[in-house]
């Protein structure tokens, strides 16, 4: 069995530092790098791409809503054409640094409120996917496991990766429990590891109300924005390897 570990990185901005990128990069195989609209700036983008190169981690674009103040976690009502061009613009910005460092772009994973909005908005999804396809149809689109956007992406001829979340609780319908609700974020590293092993080996996990949710796990999102999160990521990788699950990049998984 094989699985990819991804993390959202490059989310500092100017003098504001967010995340422990160098620490979490030791344990992951794919980096989702902010493209300057919800977080990141040109210096941070290049620094993070170079860090990924030095640590042999694959690079993906992490585009979001143009909302630095809200960190891309606030919904915006976009037309399909706006979404298409917003995505293409951000991918292009990151790709300049990717190319400058002699790398290729592996995937695109939308950020925050945009990621969640795709699950319930087909027109928005099509716009985002058209933006990705405009750039390169061979790039992998990362979306919420077993969700409609992944079906649409496959119908459009794009490669897809089903993403699960290590430290988040699930609703019975397979969506993530809102961060505003109690129990939405799981902090115990042993519980996190057992849930992820269940997702990979058993094809699902118990939802917040105890119902079984079927999931496909191609890539696992882990966090590295505080020392405990890095500790959890290190422990999770160790436990997965102990279970005989090989940690590889999306590029090796998705052909």
Curated annotation (Swiss-Prot):
Coiled coil: none annotated. One of its GO terms (biological process) is carbohydrate metabolic process. Gene3D superfamilies: Glycoside hydrolase/deacetylase. It comes from the Archaea. Forms a complex composed of PxpA, PxpB and PxpC. Belongs to the LamB/PxpA family. Catalyzes the cleavage of 5-oxoproline to form L-glutamate coupled to the hydrolysis of ATP to ADP and inorganic phosphate. This is 5-oxoprolinase subunit A. It comes from Thermococcus sibiricus (strain DSM 12597 / MM 739). The gene is pxpA.
């Amino acid at each position: 069995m094989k699985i990819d570990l991804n993390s959202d990185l490059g989310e500092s901005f100017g003098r504001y530092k967010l995340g422990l990128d160098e620490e979490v990069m030791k344990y992951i195989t794919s980096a989702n790098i902010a493209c300057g609209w919800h977080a990141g700036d040109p210096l941070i983008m290049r620094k993070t791409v170079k860090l990924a190169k030095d640590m042999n981690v694959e690079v993906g674009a992490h585009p979001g809503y143009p909302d630095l103040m809200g960190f891309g976690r606030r919904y915006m009502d976009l037309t399909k054409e706006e979404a298409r061009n917003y995505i293409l613009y951000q991918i292009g910005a990151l790709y300049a640094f990717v190319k400058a460092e002699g790398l290729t772009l592996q995937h695109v994973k939308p950020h925050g409120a945009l990621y969640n909005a795709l699950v319930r908005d087909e027109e928005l999804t099509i716009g985002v996917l058209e933006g990705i396809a405009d750039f390169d149809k061979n790039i992998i689109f990362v979306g919420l496991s077993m969700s409609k956007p992944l079906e649409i992406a496959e119908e459009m001829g794009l490669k897809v990766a089903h993403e699960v979340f290590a430290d988040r609780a699930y609703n019975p319908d397979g969506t993530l429990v809102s961060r505003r609700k109690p129990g939405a974020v799981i902090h115990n590293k042993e519980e996190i590891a057992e849930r992820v092993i269940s997702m990979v080996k058993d094809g699902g996990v118990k939802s917040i109300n105890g119902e079984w949710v079927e999931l496909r796990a191609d890539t696992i999102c882990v966090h590295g924005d505080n020392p405990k999160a890095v500790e959890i990521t290190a422990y999770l990788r160790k436990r997965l390897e102990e279970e005989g699950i090989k940690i590889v990049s999306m590029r090796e998984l998705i052909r």
